[in-house]
Amino acid sequence: MLVKKLAGKGGGRESGSEDPRPLGQRCAGTMPSCTALATLLSVVAVAFCFYLGVKTNDLQARIAALESAKGTPSFHPLSDTVDELKAMVQEKVERLLAQKSYEHMAKIRTAREAPLECNCPAGPPGKRGKRGRRGESGPPGQPGPQGPPGPKGDKGEQGDQGPRMVFPKINHGFLSADQQLIKRRLIKGDQGQAGPPGPPGPPGPRGPPGDTGKDGPRGMPGVPGEPGKPGEQGLMGPLGPPGQKGSIGAPGTPGMDGQKGEPGSPGAAGQSGLPGPKGEPGKEGEKGDAGENGPKGDTGEKGDPGSSAAGIKGEPGESGRPGQKGEPGLPGLPGLPGIKGEPGFIGPQGEPGLPGLPGTKGDRGEAGPPGRGERGDPGAPGPKGKQGESGARGPKGSKGDRGDKGDSGALGPRGPPGQKGDPGATEIIDYNGNLHEALQRITTLTVTGPPGPPGPQGLQGPKGEQGSPGIPGVDGEQGLKGSKGDMGDPGVPGEKGGLGLPGLPGANGVKGEKGDTGLPGPQGPSIIGPPGPPGPHGPPGPMGPHGLPGPKGASGLDGKPGSRGADGPIGPHGPAGPKGERGEKGAMGEPGPRGPYGLPGKDGEPGLDGFPGPRGEKGDLGEKGEKGFRGVKGEKGEPGQPGLDGLDAPCQLGPDGLPMPGCWQK
C-alpha cells in the first residue's frame, strides 16, 4: 500500500497504475525515512525513561523526608539488620508498657493557674437607649442640581387676525417648501406692528478707522502732568567704606535639618582612665520560696516475709535515666534604676573648623508679597515746555486685554563680608534631658540685633479697574524733552528702622570638613547600682518519669477517734400531757384595718374668683414643620405693555443685566 501511495503521487501517472521501477529501488527510496522515524522513537523512549527515573528518585526522597519529619521509622527489609529490628521491637514494647502503666496510675491533677481577671463571655445585648435630643441645625447644603423642566404651560390665547393677501383667489398649494423665496415675493402682507425691543446684541466687530477730522479749536494749556515713574535701576555704585561693627544679632530661626553625614573615621584611642573605686559588696539576696512537693509515689506491693537469716546482699541497681531538661523560667523583673551620676566636667571648646564650601544655588523661591514703599517727595517742577502743534484726534481704541504678571527681577550681587561679630554668650544651659525648656531659655535671651537689610523691591501690582471717563481736557502743546537734571544731594539718614522680618531659611550648605578630634573628657565616677529584686518563679516543669515502687512501709499508728455522727430521725409522738392552768388576760391588740369609704358629701358653694396668675415663661421654639406640598400653578397674567425702542448703539451690560452707567452719554 505504501508503494502504491507513493506511486500515486506522480504528476502524469494515474492512481491505479504501478511503478515500472524494480522492487529493490522502490524499497531503497523509503529506507532513510524509516530509519529516521525509528531513531526518533528510540530517542523519545530513552528520554521518557530518564524522566521517569528522575521523578521516581525525587518521590522517594520526599517520602523519606516526610517520614523523618513525622518520626515514623520506615521499614526497609532489604537494608535493615537484625540489630535494628531488635531495637525497633524493644522501643515499641517499652512504649506500650509505659502507656499501659500510665493508664493504671493514679491521676494527679495539676494546680490550675487561672487568671484573676474574669474571662466570662459577653452578656446579652442591652435594651435600646432613649432617643437623643434633636441636634442643632446644620449648615446650609450646597445648591442642588438644576431640576427637570416644568410642565407644559396652558394654551395661549388666539392671536389677532393677520393681514389680507394681495391675491386671495390664487391657490398657493403648488408652492413647495423649497420655494420660500417665491412665496415672499408673491405674497407680501401689510407691515406689522413694531415688536418689543430685543435684548442688546453682542458687540460688533471693530470698524475701519475713520477719516481724519478737521482740526479742532485751539485748546487751553494742559494741567501739569503727574510726577514721572521711578526710572530703571541704575548701575551699581562703588563699594562704600566698611560699616561700623554691628551688635550681636538675635538668634536666627533654626535652619532645616541637614542631610545625614557619612560616618566619620574612628577616633584615636583615648587615654586610659583612672581606676574606679572598689564597689561595695552587694546585699544578701532574699531566700527563695520552697518548691512544691512532688507527686506521691504509688504504694508498693507487700513483700514476702524474709527469712530469719540475713539475706544475700543484692547487686546495686542501675542508675535511672536523667530527666528531661526543664523549660527556662520567665525573665526577672527589671532592676531599680541606678543612682544618677554627677555631671562630668565640661571639656575645653574645640577650635572652629574651616569654613565650608559655598552651597549650590537653590531653586527659585516663590514671589513674596508686594512691597509697599513710602511715597517720595514731589519733584521740583520742570521748565515749561513750548506749546506744540495740535495733533489729529485718533479713533477710540478698544479695551486691551489684561497683561500677564511679569517675573520678579534678579537679585543684585552679594555684598562684601562684614567684620567678625562679637563672640556669642557662653552661658551654659543644662537642660537635664528636657530639650523644650532649653529652647525656651534660648529664645528668652534679650539680645537685639541690628535692623535687617531692606528687602528686594516688590513686584508691580496688578492693573487697576478702568476708571470712569473724565472730563475731556484741551490738548496742550507738546513740550520739548527737558535735559537731565543734576544729581541731588544725598538725603538725611533716616531713623533706625524696626527689626526686619526673619529671612527665609537658606539652602543646605555643603558638608564641611571633619573637625579635629577633641580632647577626651575626664572619666566620671563609676557608681554600682543595687542589685535588682529576684525574678518571678518559673512555670513548673513537666512531670518526670514514673518512679520505681518503694519499699514496704511500717505499720501505721492507731487512728484518731472519728467525728460525731449525724442526728438520727425523730421518734414517734408521746401521749398528751395534763391540762394546764388558765392563762392571764392578753394585751390589747393592734388597731384594725381601715373601714370602707363613706358616702359622698353634698356639693359645696362656689368659691370666690382667684387673682390672675403671673404670665408664664416663653415656651421653647417648636420643631420645624414638614415641607408643604407644591402649590397650584397660578393663572396666566395679562400681556405686558410694549417696551421702549431699542438704543441706537449697543451698550455693554453690567453684572446686574443693565447697561453700564454713562453709556448713553458717549
UniProtKB/Swiss-Prot annotation:
<feature type="region of interest" description="Disordered">
    <location>
        <begin position="445"/>
        <end position="666"/>
    </location>
</feature>
<feature type="compositionally biased region" description="Low complexity">
    <location>
        <begin position="457"/>
        <end position="466"/>
    </location>
</feature>
<feature type="domain" description="Collagen-like 1">
    <location>
        <begin position="121"/>
        <end position="164"/>
    </location>
</feature>
<feature type="site" description="Cleavage; by furin">
    <location>
        <begin position="112"/>
        <end position="113"/>
    </location>
</feature>
<feature type="region of interest" description="Interaction with amyloid-beta peptide">
    <location>
        <begin position="181"/>
        <end position="188"/>
    </location>
</feature>
<feature type="compositionally biased region" description="Basic and acidic residues">
    <location>
        <begin position="11"/>
        <end position="21"/>
    </location>
</feature>
<keyword id="KW-0735">Signal-anchor</keyword>
<feature type="domain" description="Collagen-like 6">
    <location>
        <begin position="455"/>
        <end position="514"/>
    </location>
</feature>
<dbReference type="GO" id="GO:0060385">
    <property type="term" value="P:axonogenesis involved in innervation"/>
</dbReference>
<keyword id="KW-0176">Collagen</keyword>
<dbReference type="InterPro" id="IPR008160">
    <property type="entry name" value="Collagen"/>
</dbReference>
<dbReference type="GO" id="GO:0008201">
    <property type="term" value="F:heparin binding"/>
</dbReference>
<feature type="topological domain" description="Cytoplasmic">
    <location>
        <begin position="1"/>
        <end position="33"/>
    </location>
</feature>
<keyword id="KW-0472">Membrane</keyword>
<feature type="compositionally biased region" description="Gly residues">
    <location>
        <begin position="494"/>
        <end position="503"/>
    </location>
</feature>
<dbReference type="InterPro" id="IPR050938">
    <property type="entry name" value="Collagen_Structural_Proteins"/>
</dbReference>
<keyword id="KW-0812">Transmembrane</keyword>
<feature type="compositionally biased region" description="Low complexity">
    <location>
        <begin position="230"/>
        <end position="245"/>
    </location>
</feature>
<keyword id="KW-1133">Transmembrane helix</keyword>
<comment type="subunit">
    <text>Forms homodimers and homotrimers. Binds to the fibrillized forms of amyloid-beta protein 40 (beta-APP40) and amyloid-betad protein 42 (beta-APP42). Found associated with beta-APP42 more frequently than with beta-APP40.</text>
</comment>
<feature type="compositionally biased region" description="Low complexity">
    <location>
        <begin position="336"/>
        <end position="358"/>
    </location>
</feature>
<feature type="domain" description="Collagen-like 8">
    <location>
        <begin position="589"/>
        <end position="648"/>
    </location>
</feature>
<feature type="domain" description="Collagen-like 5">
    <location>
        <begin position="373"/>
        <end position="425"/>
    </location>
</feature>
<feature type="region of interest" description="Disordered">
    <location>
        <begin position="1"/>
        <end position="24"/>
    </location>
</feature>
<feature type="compositionally biased region" description="Pro residues">
    <location>
        <begin position="528"/>
        <end position="543"/>
    </location>
</feature>
<dbReference type="Pfam" id="PF01391">
    <property type="entry name" value="Collagen"/>
</dbReference>
<feature type="topological domain" description="Extracellular">
    <location>
        <begin position="55"/>
        <end position="666"/>
    </location>
</feature>
<feature type="compositionally biased region" description="Basic and acidic residues">
    <location>
        <begin position="361"/>
        <end position="377"/>
    </location>
</feature>
<feature type="domain" description="Collagen-like 2">
    <location>
        <begin position="192"/>
        <end position="247"/>
    </location>
</feature>
<feature type="compositionally biased region" description="Basic and acidic residues">
    <location>
        <begin position="615"/>
        <end position="638"/>
    </location>
</feature>
<feature type="transmembrane region" description="Helical; Signal-anchor for type II membrane protein">
    <location>
        <begin position="34"/>
        <end position="54"/>
    </location>
</feature>
<dbReference type="GO" id="GO:0001540">
    <property type="term" value="F:amyloid-beta binding"/>
</dbReference>
<dbReference type="GO" id="GO:0005615">
    <property type="term" value="C:extracellular space"/>
</dbReference>
<protein>
    <recommendedName>
        <fullName>Collagen alpha-1(XXV) chain</fullName>
    </recommendedName>
</protein>
<feature type="compositionally biased region" description="Pro residues">
    <location>
        <begin position="140"/>
        <end position="151"/>
    </location>
</feature>
<feature type="compositionally biased region" description="Basic and acidic residues">
    <location>
        <begin position="280"/>
        <end position="290"/>
    </location>
</feature>
<feature type="region of interest" description="Disordered">
    <location>
        <begin position="189"/>
        <end position="428"/>
    </location>
</feature>
<dbReference type="GO" id="GO:0005581">
    <property type="term" value="C:collagen trimer"/>
</dbReference>
<feature type="compositionally biased region" description="Pro residues">
    <location>
        <begin position="196"/>
        <end position="208"/>
    </location>
</feature>
<keyword id="KW-0677">Repeat</keyword>
<feature type="domain" description="Collagen-like 3">
    <location>
        <begin position="249"/>
        <end position="308"/>
    </location>
</feature>
<dbReference type="GO" id="GO:0005886">
    <property type="term" value="C:plasma membrane"/>
</dbReference>
